[in-house]
Every structure is written in C-alpha cells, then in structure tokens.
Design a protein with these regions (language model features):
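Fungal secretory targeting signals
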Residues: 1-23
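Acidic/His-rich, divalent-metal-binding segments that scaffold phosphate/diphosphate chemistry
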Residues: 21-107
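Divalent metal-dependent phosphate-bond-processing catalytic cores, especially two-metal-ion Mg2+/Mn2+ enzymes
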Residues: 22-33, 60-63, 70, 77-88, ...
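A short glycine/serine-rich beta->alpha loop
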Residues: 57-63, 110-116, 216
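An active-site-proximal "capping" alpha-helix that borders the catalytic cofactor pocket
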Residues: 72, 119-135
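Short, surface-exposed loop/turn segments at secondary-structure junctions
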Residues: 85-88, 110-116, 139
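Acidic/histidine metal-binding catalytic segments
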Residues: 87-91, 137-151
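His-Asp-centered metal-binding catalytic motifs of divalent-metal-dependent phosphohydrolases/nucleases
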Residues: 92-111, 125, 129, 151-156
Length: 270
C-alpha cells in the first residue's frame, strides 16, 4: 500500500455467483478470458483465478486486507475499461496478479511464508508474487516478472516511477485509487459504487494502522529506515527512536573525512 501520489498514466458459460459471469475467449493478449466481479470486467486466466483464491486466505484474520487487494485490482480494471487505448497498452494478467498480491507481506498469520525477519514488506510481497507465478505455471519471462516485482516493491515510492514501464506504473496507480478521498475521473462513479458495495473500505485505515504496527513489532530489522518507523516509535514499546540511517552515515562520514584528509580543500556552493 502506498501513501505518496504520482501523476496518472495516459489516458458462455452459465451464470455463476452474482456479479461473476464468465466469458470465453482465447489466451493471446487481445483475447484473454474474462469474467465480471462487482460488475467490472476483469481478466480471468487460470493464474488470476489462483491469485484470487490465494488472497481469500486472508479473510478470516484480515478481511480488510482481502477487500483492499480486490479493490486495488478492480479500480485499475475499471480505469482500463473506460479507456480502450490504455487497456490495449497494459499487460492485464500482470496487472491482475501484481495488484492482487502487492501486499502479501501484510499477512499476519503465524508462519506466513511472506513475512521475513529482515526485509521490508514491499520486498517480501514482490518476492512472494514472483514465486507464486513460477509455482503456478505462469511461464513468464524474466522481463515480465521484473515489471511486476518493480510495481510491487515501488508501491510506497510513487515519485520514483518516472520513466518506468506502464505495467509497473499501473500496479502503483491502482493501489492509489484505493484510498478514500476524491474519486478519480478515470473511473466511472457507477464502477466506484459497485466495487465499494461488494468490497467495502470501512476498515481500511484501522486495518492498515494495525498491520503497520504489527510489522514494526515483529520485524524491526525490516522496518528500520522505512516509513514503518513512525508506527514503531508511536506504538511499539522499546522500538526506539526513528532511524536516520542515511543522515547519520553522511554526517558521520563528514567528520571522519575531515580528520583523515585535513589538508584537502572543499568549497561549499550553498
């Protein structure tokens, strides 16, 4: 999940459960099978179906996480459906899997395979998503895997995305649609309404606050130097003060440099 913002990119089988009517098609980029979820047409490949099944595991302990992941995917898909040129430019399967799995590192279940002791949750999520694709017959090349990984790991650093590929950008952009606030003109109001009706966002902030606090509590080695520091210092006894790794490194290095090179000349331009 991300808190920064960045500029938007450019602009039959029988009925099953309500709001999910599958449509048959080929498997090339232009003819992927689709279905409807919350009245939003989405890609429906076996890999995407497996990703949806995976995130449903979060419902018992973290229903807000499941809803967040589904909304992120569906908001992006709704924007694509509203812009044929954009939709044709995006790898829809990559987008689906990347958005659905972008917060695997939030998994609070004991012995979660996506909760390392020393990596940021974005990295755990990206590595977990790559492993998922490989283990579930995705048969993606390394470039495709990297685009998904980058979109997941950069989700909290939207300002770093300039010049990145459209697929990485749209994983992040789709997550940005997720937060309550002004609605994006890229998504129809009717689509917002159907998505929020099926996957409500009424606990997204409380759930996020709890998850970030839990991350600081359970893996401080993976949260130091990230924005999770704020939650650790605010809510976790004994976490310690907020880290200033880069600042401490540079300022400490200045003193050492002067001591080691007393005769060197440096002219400040400030």
């Amino acid at each position: 999940m991300k808190f920064s913002s960045f500029a938007s990119c450019l602009a039959a089988a029988g009925a099953v459960a309500a709001g999910r009517v599958p449509h048959q098609g080929g498997h090339d980029k232009g003819q992927l099978p689709t279905t409807k979820i919350a009245n939003i047409e989405v890609v429906d490949t076996p890999l995407v179906q497996s990703a949806v099944k995976l995130v449903k595991q979060f419902i018992p302990l973290q229903p807000y996480l499941y809803n967040h992941l589904m909304r992120s995917w569906l908001f992006g898909a709704a924007a694509f459906n509203n812009n044929a040129t954009l939709k044709a430019s995006v790898d829809l399967e990559l987008h689906a899997v990347g958005t659905l799995l972008h917060d695997l590192g939030w998994d609070m279940r004991p012995n979660s395979p996506w909760h390392s002791a020393n990596r940021p949750f974005e990295v755990d999520s990206g590595l977990g998503a790559v492993a998922f694709v490989k283990e579930n017959g995705g048969n993606w090349d390394e470039n495709r895997l990297e685009r998904m990984y980058d979109g997941i790991t950069l989700q909290g650093m939207g300002s770093y995305l300039a010049g990145k590929n459209i697929d990485s950008n749209w994983i992040v952009q789709s997550v940005e649609f997720e937060f309550p606030g002004p609605r994006s003109p890229l998504i129809r109001n009717a689509d917002y309404d159907t998505i929020l009706a099926e996957f409500p966002n009424d606990t997204v902030f409380r759930g996020t606050n709890e998850t970030f606090t839990w991350l600081a509590l359970t893996k401080p080695a993976g949260t130091r130097g990230t924005f999770i520091d704020y939650f650790g210092t605010a809510y976790v006894p004994g976490y310690g003060p907020q880290s200033h790794v880069a600042f401490d490194l540079i300022t400490g290095g200045v003193a050492d440099e002067i001591a080691q090179h007393p005769n060197s000349t440096f002219v400040s331009n400030l």
